[in-house]
Amino acid sequence: MAAHIVTVMTKIEETLKIALEAHAGQEDLDGNPAILHPLAVGLMGNSDAEIKTGFLHDVVEDSSMTLEDLKNKGVEDEVIAALALLSHDKEKVGYFEYVENIIASGNVTAIHVKLNDLHHNLQRGKVSYEAAVASND
């Protein structure tokens, strides 16, 4: 049992290191370190996959890392599948269609992480709701 916990924690730590690397030097709309939001979303997760996906949910959109890069760094297929759904190509898909696609996928990890993402975005409250939605369109 102890070995399993160490393995799980090591994978979560590796995922956290990837997120820290990807968001190094970035700031959010409020001027805070960008990593704080993915950390909060990850810590809201109810499973290892949700924690890891939460930590990485903004990496593809907000850094030069791709899903393939993440896969090459050892990120599990379950997390990659959720990240593929959570990565929003704003040029091709409107925000509400993007959210509908996540829901329609039935991917529980992606759905929970998106809910946690929205919850944390609304909690922060410094940037208006309208500005947050506009930044996603």
Segments from the language model and where they lie:
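Active-site helical microenvironments for divalent-metal-assisted chemistry
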Residues: 2-137
